[in-house]
Every structure is written in C-alpha cells, then in structure tokens.
C-alpha cells in the first residue's frame, strides 16, 4: 500500500460527537464477517482494541509476548497486552499490531447499531502515509508533496514533524503576548482543552461560561469549566511566521496535559515545554484542516485562491 495513491475511505462524522470514525471489517472464528467502528485518533500513538468489546463482537486476535504501558496526556499509564489483528479498511487488508486495553474506554459502545471496538493511532497513519482530511471527511493516502503544496496556497500551515519527533504526537503552537505554548492537534478529542494556569499566565481574553463538566481519557478523568477564549495559532509563511486569530470554546482544566515533570526531553536531553492543552476535532472540522501524516503537515488550503 505504501506505493499506492488511490486509497480512500469515508469517515463517519456523528452529530454532537465530531471525532472521526472509520468502519473496519473482520472475520470471526466461524468465518463470519463483522463490521465495527474505530476512532481515527491522531493523539493515540498506538492502535488499541477495547478487549471486552472486541471479544463480545467476535474479534479474533493473535496474542504477542510482552505488555505496553499507554496513557492519554496527563493521565496515569495503563498496562496493555500486545496482539495482532487482521482487518479490512476500505478495499485494503491489514494485519497490524494492537494494544489490548482491559476494561472500558469512555467512548460510545456503538453508533447506529455498529459497535465501536477501538482506536487507529498515528503510527498506523504514518506507516501508510495517510491523511485525515476534514474537507470531505475522508481518510486517504497523502496526495501532496513539498513540491506541490506551497505554503502561499494555505491559510494555515504547521509542520507536524516537530511534534511527532519531540512528543510522539502532532502539536500546534498558540502565540500569546509574544510567547508560544504547545497544544496537541487531537482528532480523537471532541472538545478543545486548555490549562487554567496558561490562561492566567498568558493573560488570555477569556470569558468563563460557568458550565462544569468532566472529561475522560483512557486512564482517568478531570473536572473542567467551559470558557470562550480568543487565541492565535502560529502558522508558517514563505518568509517567516505569522498568527491566525480565532475564538472558540475551550474546556479549562486545572492541569497541563503533559508537564515537564513527566520527563519529556528532546534527543539532546533538553526538557521540552509542557503541553498545556489541545485543539479537538470540532475545531479542525470547522476549519477544514488536513492532518497529513505522509508529508507531516497540518494545513488548510486557501479555497478562494
């Protein structure tokens, strides 16, 4: 598949829950074919199967030796078992490594009668050079290159490789009063999140809306409040950098998603800045971004040019 350019599947966009879902098919031990959904999650490094759900719906996997610790940003790590799972996505067959998560995950158990059994992570998308395209809600093989995607043709452009190399996750930069803070570009998230300390330190124009909620990751939850926040996303230009002004609702958390104390360092051992929040799928869908794991760019084409 790495040499093919015609792979494309339609992603399911659910009203009120704008994380993208991909439909996969697989065969159970009795050779019966099943369909299920997986979240297409840019901020999960690994593919994940929700063990009990997968077993309930006839998934057969091949157990591998060893375990792996995984976790959402800011949450405690969870130990998972390792396996390989054979499935079909669109017209392509895959036999891929998965982490088997015991217990449940705070995502719906099904949509329209189709079960949700797991997550496709960014290592899968990097391996097969896939792009999450919010223009037409598809997952497809990267169809751009550094030569045919000019920065001048984009209303927004940020190199995904920076985050993938340093954090293992795609990141963005919010510039506030001359200072840049790091946030994740998280297709699996249904809300924007930002730490209250960042709001305070940066002097953001922020209106607390008063709504209190709890958001949950793979290993835990945290209490948040809704706020309308004005913010500027750093974007590359042909000459230097610029900012794009936005205003959107964020869930304000008491915690960073990834703190310096968690020991994230670059390849030279220098401690990385904390991850103070994330931009979720509803915002990216509204902006019609493309998260392209082939060329490792996040961009929004200027459709009026």
What are these regions (language model features)?
Residues 1-305:
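Pepsin/retropepsin-fold aspartyl endopeptidases
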């Amino acid at each position: 598949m790495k040499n093919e350019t015609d792979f494309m599947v339609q992603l399911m966009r659910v009203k009120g829950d704008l994380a993208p879902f991909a439909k996969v098919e697989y065969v159970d031990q009795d050779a019966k074919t099943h369909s299920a959904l997986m979240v297409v999650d840019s901020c999960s490094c690994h593919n994940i199967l929700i063990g009990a759900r997968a077993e309930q719906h006839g998934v057969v996997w091949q157990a591998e030796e060893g375990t792996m610790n995984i976790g959402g940003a800011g949450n405690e790590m969870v130990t998972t078992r390792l396996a390989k799972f054979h499935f079909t996505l669109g017209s392509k067959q895959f036999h891929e490594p998965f982490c088997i998560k015991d217990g449940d995950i705070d995502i719906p158990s099904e949509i329209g009668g189709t079960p949700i059994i797991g997550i496709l992570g960014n290592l899968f998308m990097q391996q097969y050079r896939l792009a999450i395209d919010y223009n037409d809600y598809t997952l497809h093989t990267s169809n751009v290159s550094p030569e045919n995607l000019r920065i001048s043709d984009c209303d927004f452009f940020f190199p995904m490789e920076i985050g993938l190399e340093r954090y293992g996750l795609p990141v963005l930069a919010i510039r506030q009063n001359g200072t840049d803070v790091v946030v994740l570009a998280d297709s699996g998230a249904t809300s924007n999140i930002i730490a209250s300390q960042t709001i305070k330190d940066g002097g953001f124009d922020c209106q607390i809306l008063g709504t209190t909620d709890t958001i949950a990751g793979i290993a835990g939850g945290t209490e948040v409040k809704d706020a309308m926040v004005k913010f500027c996303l750093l974007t590359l230009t042909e000459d230097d950098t610029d900012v794009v002004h936005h205003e959107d609702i964020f869930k304000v958390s008491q915690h960073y998603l990834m703190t310096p104390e968690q020991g994230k360092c670059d390849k030279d051992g220098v401690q990385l800045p904390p991850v103070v929040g994330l931009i979720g799928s509803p915002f990216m869908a509204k902006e019609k971004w493309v998260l392209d794991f082939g060329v490792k760019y996040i961009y929004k084409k200027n459709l009026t040019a």
